[in-house]
Amino acid sequence: MTKQVEIFTDGSCLGNPGPGGYGAILRYKQHEKTFSAGYYLTTNNRMELMAAIVALEALTSPCEVTLSTDSQYVRQGITQWIHNWKKRGWKTADRKPVRNVDLWQRLDLAIQSHTIQWEWVKGHAGHPENERCDELARQGANSPTLDDTGYNPD
């Protein structure tokens, strides 16, 4: 039987661009694991993507995943926009390079072996897991230790 996993994610950025962090919670039955990191210079969207990527990459076998995010950018990007981006060679409808393509490609790879239900939750609205992820993300942003090597301030 396929494992049923819940993932909750959030990203934060102080300045946008600026110091940023992500937080994620991975829950399987009664087990829970949290993920968090901070970057010296990044964007909010990159941190939202990283939260989902890191949690999904932690899964070691195919799972049925419910992934909750407060980022419409992540949810719409992975459920709607990515298909055409890939058809166009990672270009937008107006033929410009997709922003954050390094992370979109990594997320695309991370989802391949899983069945994922992408759920949007309103941020800062009292959703307990989203609030915890927000706290983890802000902690990361407030004490960065990593360079976001893929960040391109074009």
Swiss-Prot record:
Asked whether the UniProt record includes Cytoplasm among its keywords, one would answer yes
Q: Name one GO cellular component term.
A: cytoplasm
Do you know which PROSITE patterns this protein is assigned to? RNASE_H_1
Q: What is its EC number?
A: 3.1.26.4
Q: Which reaction does it catalyse?
A: Endonucleolytic cleavage to 5'-phosphomonoester
Q: Which residues bind Mg(2+) 1?
A: D10, E48, D70
A GO MF annotation of the entry reads:
nucleic acid binding
Q: Which GO terms describe its biological process?
A: DNA replication, removal of RNA primer
List the Pfam families: RNase_H (PF00075)
> Residue ranges of the RNase H type-1 domain?
1-142
Leading EC class:
hydrolase
The UniProt record gives the binding positions of Mg(2+) 2 as D10, D134
Q: Does the keyword Protein biosynthesis apply?
A: no
Q: Which cofactor does it need?
A: Mg(2+)
How the cofactor is bound: the record states: Binds 1 Mg(2+) ion per subunit. May bind a second metal ion at a regulatory site, or after substrate binding.
Record InterPro entries: RNase_H, RNaseH-like_sf, RNaseH_domain, RNaseH_sf, RNaseHI
Keyword set, alphabetical order: Cytoplasm, Endonuclease, Hydrolase, Magnesium, Metal-binding, Nuclease
Cellular compartments annotated:
Cytoplasm
Q: What does this protein do?
A: Endonuclease that specifically degrades the RNA of RNA-DNA hybrids.
Q: Which HAMAP family match?
A: RNase_H
Q: Which NCBIfam families match?
A: PRK00203.1
Hey, which family's this protein in? Belongs to the RNase H family.
Subunit structure of this entry? Monomer.
**In its UniProt entry, what is this protein called?**
Ribonuclease HI
Q: From what organism does this protein derive?
A: Yersinia pestis
Upper lineage is:
Bacteria, Pseudomonadati, Pseudomonadota, Gammaproteobacteria, Enterobacterales
What is this protein's gene name?
A: rnhA
